[in-house]
Curated annotation (Swiss-Prot):
Taxonomic lineage of the native organism: Bacteria, Pseudomonadati, Pseudomonadota, Gammaproteobacteria, Enterobacterales
Name the UniProt record assigns to this protein: Bifunctional glutamine synthetase adenylyltransferase/adenylyl-removing enzyme
GO CC, one annotated term: cytosol
Source species of the chain: Salmonella schwarzengrund (strain CVM19633)
The family this protein is said to belong to: Belongs to the GlnE family.
One GO MF term attached to the UniProt entry: magnesium ion binding
Reported function: Involved in the regulation of glutamine synthetase GlnA, a key enzyme in the process to assimilate ammonia. When cellular nitrogen levels are high, the C-terminal adenylyl transferase (AT) inactivates GlnA by covalent transfer of an adenylyl group from ATP to specific tyrosine residue of GlnA, thus reducing its activity. Conversely, when nitrogen levels are low, the N-terminal adenylyl removase (AR) activates GlnA by removing the adenylyl group by phosphorolysis, increasing its activity.
PANTHER family the record matches: BIFUNCTIONAL GLUTAMINE SYNTHETASE ADENYLYLTRANSFERASE_ADENYLYL-REMOVING ENZYME, GLUTAMINE SYNTHETASE ADENYLYLTRANSFERASE
Region of interest (Adenylyl transferase), ranges: 450-947
Gene assigned in the entry: glnE
Length: 947
């Protein structure tokens, strides 16, 4: 055993003062002295439980003692009579065994692979023990869940990630997926439940038993986000639902996660065999699967971008060359070749590395370096976490913990440890970079082309200087370019740029100037790019990105030249520069039906309990997607209707995620309203009005939302902090508004306007569905019924969605007096025009002025309210284009007029989109769009001017 280093010997004196009664400095072994000096977690634990220290002093932990965990836990749970005592015993058992593992690990009594195995077996033992106790308790309360043939149904638990691979780290959270075999009902209990309800309640109690902090701490943080549909999906799924999801909707990244999935308790019963057989074809294809390469390349890009974005230099898991990159390297081969090569199907990393070597998929030396690096990094990670039983992978900044880690890793001192770590991570990064290579490099021709621009950049030319490379520019443009360069250099003098930053900038700028100044709009483009560069000069990683990836630089120049809005976004949020790396995704927005899944995958990388990082991630995802939509718009690959479709689908995905976050936070605090025990869903809906409801969002549109619930009176929540159910939904809506509007370093998510709710700003923020129906039928104004034409549920369970749709249909199909309706709609429009329109006397406001977009919207709304009682099909859609189609199909409007209004409407909206990209207001010269305006005005007179 290595003697304690000088700083640790000094710290031992502090430990001596805290030793439990009955133990003295002289009575303790050298082993105990080392462990208690190294780990505050171990010290705190034995102070609270001195018998654990006596136990360890009398007999050291053994490598194979994990085989006894299940028996030891069974003894500990023998006297448990309720959930509270179960939670206490689970927490004490976990702490006791973790002290034993920390002891063995610190002293190297057991090799590092066995430590990972012990940590994983401990977690599995606790999960299975808690499940089995709670299953029996739930059966006593509600009966045993059975299939239609009367066969009892178990809860099967898939351990994912490091837990599934038998490689859990010291203070890890656990990723789980719950499943049960077949539908049916409980039998033999005081009341009958269907199996879905039974297993959901069991799952909730199991998570609480493991996850909820008490005075004894918690057992494990439980993360359920890897299940189908993530947080928005059922907590527990039947085999049929699982199979359907993975066959029809399973994504490549879910295959990636499922490689390590392992059944907890791992019984060889028929149900377990069936579940394994069902999942195997999804994970491992029977052929060599090169189709997954692009998906893996995208994952690799995501990893590299996250390293850049979060500046994870001291993170041994997520940083460049860290644990995650080794895991990725191994899983690349598993996903591509695992179907054909059974030896690659191991859930554990090290056996898979051996198989990669045996199959000659990587050079022997690379495999050897990866193995050594992996074991080094995993030991370092576990030692780091065992100091305080804290889930961290970030190297410490304080001298004491640095001294501890250097001693634990058998290094002379901290600098030596950092040197060894740097070498290992560099080896990993090299293999990672060479895998699925997609890096770019300058060609000799590009180098030659940029060489003359070094003079322009480095020699600080004056406005009146002449230089051959600027000769093609007009005098004014040349002066502007030189002024911009000079001003930029002055700005740089004020910034604390290190030597590496200066070096990269000097390498980048000649290339950038060569590309920018070859354009006719060189001065304008450069004026948009220099603010962005000024914002990132102290962040060398982003300069390196533009310098090392010429393609990214070209896309930056093209997009900034095309749109000052994009230039402003990139300057404000430089992490968006990562999006420029892959033109395949930059100009191809996410498929409209895939935004939710992409966002779910994006959020999985952020700890669920880290609310601040969750807020940042939502905003970053939105900005990246917005950039891709705008890039496709500029490139002409998205017509106006599709731009709005994408912006709307994106907004719906964000709403879904925000509601999930708010719901999770509220339920953690109060439990959920008790009426939900008897039904599926959350009893909550978000209704989108206006542009969101009508699939017509623009780049800077806010969201018009109202919130509905179906909670009866006098219902309470079922948590420890019990509140009224309706109060719960009010606080939920307030939380949603807060999550949307909180300003982080990445800005706000969306401006949200909830004033279209019943009684407007004076009304309750959230309304019961019954109260909403009553208000619409008896109190709402005509303009509120007009707004309802463009309303639809954008988040909600089927029950509430059907209820809202029925109310909307009833209101819209109510017979109205034609003259009265015509007058009210026309007068409302005149009021709006007086308030909003014609502010720029010599300009045409595309939206608000006569003959503009709002007139078309009012015509469509009027005709739906006027004729829907005769033609109920008019209520089907909430967007103007399809409403105009319906009006023609149902004989209300002449087909030629409907088509002409549609063309006018899409033309005007297209112009608004492009004005937004140019950061210009929504008005143009009076001479513009005269044909469209005349057509709209004629239609207005036909329908809404009294005869």
């Amino acid at each position: 055993m290595t003697p304690l280093s000088s700083p640790l010997s000094q710290y031992w004196q502090t430990v001596v003062e805290r030793l439990p009664e009955g133990f003295t400095e002289t009575s303790l072994s050298a082993q105990a002295k080392s462990v208690l000096t190294f780990s505050d977690f171990a010290l705190d634990s034995v102070i609270a439980h001195p018998e654990w220290l006596a136990e360890l002093e009398s007999a050291s932990p053994q490598a194979d003692e994990w085989r006894h965990y299940a028996g030891w836990l069974q003894e500990a749970l023998a006297g448990v009579c309720d959930d509270a005592s179960l939670m206490r015993e689970l927490r004490l058992f976990r702490r006791r065994i973790m002290v034993r593992i920390a002891w063995a690990q610190t002293l190297s009594l057991v090799d590092d692979e066995t430590i990972l195995q012990q940590l994983s077996h401990l977690a599995e033992t606790l999960i299975v023990g808690a499940r089995d106790w709670l299953y029996a308790a739930c059966c006593r309360e509600w009966g045993t869940p059975c299939n239609p043939q009367g066969v009892p149904q178990p809860l099967l638990i898939l351990g994912m990630g490091k837990l599934g691979g038998g490689e859990l780290n010291f203070s890890s959270d656990i990723d789980l997926i719950f499943a049960w075999p077949e539908h049916g009902e409980t039998r033999g209990g005081r009341r009958e439940l269907d199996n879905a309800q039974f297993f959901t309640r069991l799952g909730q109690r199991l998570i609480k038993a493991l996850d909820q902090p008490t005075m004894d701490g918690f057992v494990y943080r439980v993360d359920m986000r890897l299940r189908p549909f993530g947080d928005s999906g059922p907590l527990v799924l039947s085999f049929a639902a699982l199979e359907d999801y993975y066959q029809e909707q399973g994504r490549d990244w879910e295959r990636y996660a499922m490689v390590k999935a392992r059944l907890m308790g791992d019984n060889d019963d028929a149900w377990s065999r069936e579940l394994r057989a069902m999942l195997r074809p999804f994970v491992f294809r029977r052929y060599i699967d090169f189709s997954v390469i692009q998906s893996l390349r995208n994952m690799k890009g995501m990893i590299a971008r996250e390293v850049r974005r979060r500046g994870l230099k001291d993170n041994i898991k997520l940083g460049a060359g860290g644990i995650r990159e080794i895991e990725f390297i191994v899983q690349v081969f598993q996903l591509i070749r695992g179907g054909r090569e059974p030896s690659l199907q191991s859930r554990s990393l090290l056996p898979t590395l051996d198989a990669i070597a045996a199959l000659h998929l990587l050079p022997e030396n690379d495999v050897a370096q990866l193995r050594v690096a992996y074991l080094f990094l995993r030991r370092l990670e576990n030692l780091l976490q065992s100091i305080n039983d804290e889930q961290t992978q970030t190297l410490p900044a304080d001298d004491l913990n640095r001294a501890r880690l250097a001693w634990g890793m058998k290094a002379e001192n901290w600098p030596q440890l950092v040197g060894e770590l740097t070498d290992h991570m560099a080896n990993v990064r090299r293999v990672f970079n060479e895998l699925i290579g997609d890096d770019e490099a300058d060609t000799p021709q590009e180098e030659e082309r940029s060489e003359p621009w070094r003079e322009v950049w480095q020699d600080a030319l004056q406005e009146d200087d002449s230089t051959p490379v600027l000769a093609h520019l007009a005098d004014e443009d040349r002066r502007q370019v030189l002024t911009l360069i000079a001003d930029f250099r002055k700005e740089l003098d004020k910034r604390p740029i290190g030597p590496r930053g200066r070096q990269v900038l000097d390498q980048l700028m000649p290339h950038l100037l060569a590309d920018v100044c070859s354009r006719e709009d060189a001065a304008v483009t450069l004026s948009r790019i220099t603010p962005l560069l000024a914002g990132i000069v102290t962040r060398t990683t982003y300069l390196e990105l533009l310098s090392e990836f010429p393609g990214a630089l070209k896309h930056l120049i093209m997009l900034c030249a095309a749109s000052p809005m994009i230039a402003s976004q990139l300057a404000r949020y430089p992490l968006l520069l990562d999006e420029l790396l892959d033109p395949g995704t930059l100009y191809q927005p996410t498929a409209t039906d895939a935004y939710r899944d992409e966002l779910r995958q994006y959020l999985l990388r952020v700890p669920e309990e880290d609310e601040e990082q969750q807020l940042e991630a939502l905003r970053q995802f939105k900005q990246a997607q917005l950039l891709r939509i705008a890039a496709a718009d500029i490139a002409g690959t998205l017509p106006v209707m599709k731009v709005s479709d994408h912006l709307t689908w994106l907004a719906e995905a964000m709403i879904d995620a925000v509601v999930q976050q708010a719901w999770t936070q509220m339920v953690a605090r109060y439990g959920q309203p008790a009426h939900l025990d008897e039904r599926q869903g959350r009893g909550f809906a978000v209704v989108g009005y206006g542009k969101l409801g009508g699939w017509e969002l623009g780049y800077s549109s806010d969201l018009d939302l109202i919130f509905l619930h179906d909670c009866p009176m006098d219902v309470m929540t079922n948590g420890e902090r019990e509140i009224d159910g309706r109060q719960f939904y009010l606080r939920l809506a307030q939380r949603i508004m807060h999550l949307f509007s909180t300003r982080t370093s990445s800005g706000i998510l969306y401006e949200v306007d909830a004033r279209l709710r019943p009684s407007g700003a004076a009304g309750m923020l959230v309304t019961s569905a019954d109260a909403f129906a009553d208000y619409q039928q008896h109190e709402a104004w005509t303009w509120e019924h007009q707004a309802l034409v463009r309303a639809r549920v954008v988040y909600g369970d089927p029950q509430l969605t059907s209820q809202f749709d029925a109310v909307r249909r009833t209101i819209m199909t109510t017979a109205r007096d034609g003259k009265t309706l015509q007058t009210e709609v026309r007068e409302m429009r005149e009021k709006m025009r007086a308030h909003l329109g014609n502010k720029h006397r010599d300009r045409f406001d595309i939206k608000a002025d006569e003959g503009g977009i709002t007139d078309i919207e009012f015509i469509a709304q009027y005709l739906v309210l006027r004729y829907a009682h005769e033609k109920p099909k008019l209520t089907r859609w909430s967007d103007n284009v399809r409403i105009l189609e319906l009006l023609a199909q149902n004989g209300i409007m002449d087909e030629h007029e409907a088509q002409a209004l549609t063309v006018a409407y899409t033309t005007l909206r297209d112009e608004l989109h492009h004005l937004a990209l140019q950061e210009l207001p929504g008005h143009v010269a009076q001479t513009c769009f005269s044909k469209e305006r005349a057509l709209v005005q004629a239609s207005w007179r036909k329908w809404l001017v009294a005869v």
